[in-house]
Amino acid sequence: MSTSLNYKSFSKEQQTMDNLEKQLICPICLEMFTKPVVILPCQHNLCRKCASDIFQASNPYLPTRGGTTVASGGRFRCPSCRHEVVLDRHGVYGLQRNLLVENIIDIYKQESTRPEKKLDQPMCEEHEEERINIYCLNCEVPTCSLCKVFGAHKDCQVAPLTHVFQRQKSELSDGIAVLVGSNDRVQGVISQLEDTCKTIEECCRKQKQDLCEKFDHLYGILEERKTEMTQAITRTQEEKLEHVRTLIRKYSDHLENVSKLVESGIQFMDEPEMAVFLQNAKTLLQKIVEASKAFQMEKLEQGYEIMSNFTVNLNREEKIIREIDFSREEEEEEDAGEIDEEGEGEDAVEVEEAENVQIASSGEEESLEKAAEPSQLPAELQVAPEPLPASSPEPFSSMPPAADVLVTQGEVVPIGSQQTTQSETSGPSAAETADPLFYPSWYKGQSRKTSSNPPCTHGSEGLGQIGPLGIEDSSVQSAEVAEAATNEQAAVSGKESSSTAATSQIGFEAPSPQGQSAALGSGGGADPEPARHVFSFSWLNSLNE
């Protein structure tokens, strides 16, 4: 207890001496005042030597002798408060000495040179003659042996001071080391945070610069577009103004001519001589009639001057601009992942479809080889192909919708031969009631005969599907065509010319004139044999080859 008090008193005395030393420092030489010490009128103190140096520096042109100013009088400023000090004829020697400060300096020097008192071993407060030599572990205070034997610590555990001293000293040293290490780590974290601040500032500066550049680019685009649209309005304005001004000039010239004509007519009305009047009246009347009939006023369209076609609606663009925001990398990565997954799924579906097509095509090739022979038409129904007329401009799309066909490797089969529905079995088909120009006879006959067959499972899949059904029916078609050709109505012959022109562009070939005349000759009488329309698709077969 007494040791701590002594230590506190010693530290307090040392602090007092340090504060006193600060008050005894000269503001010029920054050292302790040297006697004699003079006091200025502003109550600040200076060494006389320092005051003389300031005076000489302020008055450099005054004569000196032995380093001192000879002339009397002068002035200088206080170095502490800049107050002007006026000297009398004695100069700096006329300033009063501060004896109090000189005495304090002497006392301070004596105390500072006195040897330090050695602190003796502290004594026990209860037993003044006993030294503190043990440490109470329970109370955690140093004490003496008598306190352990008879005093307040007789029931406590004690230990020698040296053991406790070494232990606490090591603990204190370890604690200091931990604090030092912690301070180093904190300092490292502070350095990292400072670097992070610099990085943040640099990155933000770059992002701001990039953002400004992008917005400047947008500004440039808007300005460019604004200039282009303004120029378009200006061009239209000039064109319309030129047109209107042309009309103004035209009407002005006409008005001027009519005014002159009216003026001359009024003057001619005052002619007193009837003979002269009648001689010139016809010519004047003719001019008036021509002027009234020849001139036609051109009226401008309604809203010609409004320029409503240049109205701009920027609501959508304004909404888009207001929704401009920073892009998020996480959302972009998720979108990219979803797109990749969708692409992989589509690739897998395409691979499966390609495999199925390969398998189907392999089976179809075998069936095509077997059914290639019976697909030929009878020789009596085949007609030599004639070249298409070069002057027919009708496109391929002029083909009648009922003439859709199914293309296979060996031949071309009409779709109607593969598609059978419930309506065909219950009543007359649409091909029977339709115009024969759009539906050939063999197509109607085949639809009637094949209505009892089971419906095709793959015939409704659309044009271009290849299957064995088209090949199996090809042999039946040859006989059906021959039978259906004899059942054509007489109305077909009346529309033969238009049907031939409509179908000549897409591969339908009509019989030649020689064949028609032969058919008429063989039929004889008033009931000639109806013309036969044969479909030739040899040019499609050549494409497959």
From Swiss-Prot:
Residue ranges under compositional bias (Polar residues)?
417-428, 486-506
Name any Gene Ontology BP term. Answer: macrophage migration
Q: Which reaction does it catalyse?
A: S-ubiquitinyl-[E2 ubiquitin-conjugating enzyme]-L-cysteine + [acceptor protein]-L-lysine = [E2 ubiquitin-conjugating enzyme]-L-cysteine + N(6)-ubiquitinyl-[acceptor protein]-L-lysine
Q: Which PROSITE patterns match?
A: COS, ZF_BBOX, ZF_RING_1, ZF_RING_2
A GO molecular-function descriptor: protein-macromolecule adaptor activity
Name used for this protein in its record? Tripartite motif-containing 55
Q: Where is this protein chiefly located? A: nucleus
Residues in B box-type zinc fingers run: 119-161
Organism per entry: Mus musculus (Mouse)
Induction record: Expression is inhibited by the LPS/TLR4 pathway.
The residue ranges of the COS domain are 269-327
Q: What post-translational modification does the entry describe?
A: Targeted for degradation through the proteasomal and lysosomal pathways in the presence of SUMO3.
Q: Where is the sequence biased in composition, kind Acidic residues? A: 328-352
Q: Where does Zn(2+) bind?
A: C124, H127, C147, H153
Q: Where in the cell is it found?
A: Nucleus; Cytoplasm
Record's function text: E3 ubiquitin ligase that plays an important role in regulating cardiac development and contractility, muscle growth, metabolism, and fiber-type differentiation. Acts as a critical factor that regulates cardiomyocyte size during development in concert with TRIM63 by regulating E2F1-mediated gene expression. Plays a role in apoptosis induction in cardiomyocytes by promoting ubiquitination of the DUSP1 phosphatase. Promotes non-canonical NF-kappa-B signaling and B-cell-mediated immune responses by mediating NFKB2 'Lys-48'-linked ubiquitination and processing.
Region annotation (Disordered) maps to: 324-352, 359-378, 417-532
Gene3D superfamilies per record: 1.20.5.170, Classic Zinc Finger (3.30.160.60), Zinc/RING finger domain, C3HC4 (zinc finger) (3.30.40.10)
* Consequences of knocking out this gene: TRIM55 deficiency does not affect B-cell development in the bone marrow and the transitional stages in the spleen. However, mutant mice display an impaired germinal center formation and antibody production. Moreover, TRIM55 deficiency suppresses the activation of B-cells in response to various stimuli such as anti-CD40 or BAFF. The double deletion TRIM63 and TRIM55 mice die in utero and peri-natally and exhibit a spontaneous cardiac hypertrophy from birth. Mechanistically, hearts have decreased E2F1 occupancy at promoter regions of multiple E2F1-regulated genes compared to WT.
UniProt zinc finger (RING-type) residues: 26-82
One Pfam family from the record: zf-B_box
Comp. bias (Low complexity) = 474-485
Does the keyword section mention Nucleus? yes
Tissue expression remark: Widely expressed in various tissues, besides skeletal muscle and heart, such as brain, lung, liver, spleen and kidney.
- Which EC number applies? 2.3.2.27
Q: Which InterPro entries match?
A: COS_domain, E3_ligase_FN3/SPRY, Znf-RING_euk, Znf_B-box, Znf_RING, Znf_RING/FYVE/PHD, Znf_RING_CS
